[in-house]
Amino acid sequence: MVPPLPLLLLLLLVPQGGHGCQGSELDREIVLAKVRALFLDALGPPAVTGEGGDPGVRRLPRRHALGGFARRGSEPEEEDVSQAILFPASGSRCEDEPAAGELAQEAEQGLFTYMFRPSQHMRSRQVTSAHLWFHTGLDRQGTAASNSSEPLLGLLALSSGGPMAVPVTLGQAPPCWAVLHLAASALPLLTHPVLVLLLRCPLCSCSARPEATPFLVAHTRARPPSGGERTRRSTPPLPWPWSPAALRLLQRPPEEPAAHANCHRAALNISFQELGWDRWIVHPRSFIFHYCHGGCGLSAPPDLPLPVPEVPPTPIQPLSLVPGAQPCCAALPGTMRPLRVRTTSDGGYSFKYEIVPNLLTQHCACI
């Protein structure tokens, strides 16, 4: 018996992507393969640019990159380094009052006291090198004439236990100046809120000129991450990004296992990165793909009224367009919704808005 023509037309309009005649569990790769086929059928293959011919390896310019300014994998990561110059705090110069008399007396003894206040930013970083510039007022001939068993310059740091020696080495410096490079063991001193240095120079005099003010130069870099932060940074990213729709999908109350055996609308969060098209389809980054899945048994749908006691239930027959045909869980004709996407074929210099029709299922039934 040949079915009427309207029934045949309606049968042809039923989407073939319902996945309803599969088993109780549907493999994710099967759904992804179906989604790829639907996109390629609607949009065609992505444009091939470059010698490689792989649209997945094209990179968007930084101004078009989604999710912030991501670094390219081929570029080395730039190290976070900085340089800071510290001048002595007030009261550490010869012209300051009332400390002028005390400093002049110390200068006669060849001892100069300077107080530095490292910033909070510097204290939060790792100091890699530091050197103190001090105006000695001595030319090279005077320095050579003062050579003796006692060193010309010595550096002390004031601590809770009293002054302690700071290991330093003399570096190259212009005339009338001395550069003292702090040893690595003394670098943690610059991570304290207050640093008091005592410089011993028997032949030096205290100068009140602004251009003779000593200063401290420090080079810093970001501290290496701790064990917990390193673990979090090394954790590989999720294969697909989170979205509000995916979060709502996870927050749904759990369903009975039997409900998944019957015909129902299933959902799957799919990202274009997972499909290998994140450089072709740039928006949205992910979407919830709804499809029909499950068997078409004779159990009553959950929205039907409960049976009356002592009254035999009436068997529920599934909707079938063709008499004698096996019903299949599929989307109702006319209820499919499209998906709007934004694509690029030149690495992000131009965009195209396209529509994938009949992609998202709204209602499922046994047909």
UniProtKB/Swiss-Prot annotation:
PANTHER family on file: INHIBIN ALPHA CHAIN, TGF-BETA FAMILY
Q: Is Glycoprotein found in the keyword set?
A: yes
Q: What SUPFAM superfamilies is this protein classified in?
A: Cystine-knot cytokines (SSF57501)
Which residues does the record annotate as propeptide?
Answer: 21-63, 64-233
Give one GO biological process term. hemoglobin biosynthetic process
Looking up Pfam families in the UniProt record yields: TGF_beta
Q: Which gene encodes it?
A: INHA
Q: Where is this site: Cleavage?
A: R63, H64, R233, S234
Q: Assembly and interactions?
A: Dimeric, linked by one or more disulfide bonds. Activin B is a dimer of alpha and beta-B. Inhibin A is a dimer of alpha and beta-A. Inhibin B is a dimer of alpha and beta-B. Interacts with TGFBR3L; this interaction regulates female fertility.
What domain of life?
Eukaryota
Q: Where the protein is mainly located, per its record?
A: secreted
Query: Is Signal tagged as a keyword?
Result: yes
Tell me the protein's name. Answer: Inhibin alpha chain
Residues carrying sugar: N147, N269
SS bonds (residue pairs): C263-C329, C292-C364, C296-C366
> Which species is this UniProt entry from?
Equus caballus (Horse)
- PTM comment for this protein? Proteolytic processing yields a number of bioactive forms, consisting either solely of the mature alpha chain, of the most N-terminal propeptide linked through a disulfide bond to the mature alpha chain, or of the entire proprotein.
Q: A single GO CC term, please?
A: extracellular space
Q: Where is the signal peptide?
A: 1-20
What molecular function terms (GO) are annotated for this protein? cytokine activity; growth factor activity; hormone activity
Q: What does this protein do?
A: Inhibins and activins inhibit and activate, respectively, the secretion of follitropin by the pituitary gland. Inhibins/activins are involved in regulating a number of diverse functions such as hypothalamic and pituitary hormone secretion, gonadal hormone secretion, germ cell development and maturation, erythroid differentiation, insulin secretion, nerve cell survival, embryonic axial development or bone growth, depending on their subunit composition. Inhibins appear to oppose the functions of activins. Inhibin A is a dimer of alpha/INHA and beta-A/INHBA that functions as a feedback regulator in the hypothalamic-pituitary-gonadal (HPG) axis. Inhibits the secretion of FSH from the anterior pituitary gland by acting on pituitary gonadotrope cells. Antagonizes activin A by binding to the proteoglycan, betaglycan, and forming a stable complex with and, thereby, sequestering type II activin receptors while excluding type I receptor.
Cite the entry's keywords alphabetically.
Answer: Cleavage on pair of basic residues, Disulfide bond, Glycoprotein, Growth factor, Hormone, Secreted, Signal
What does the UniProt entry say about where the protein is found? Secreted
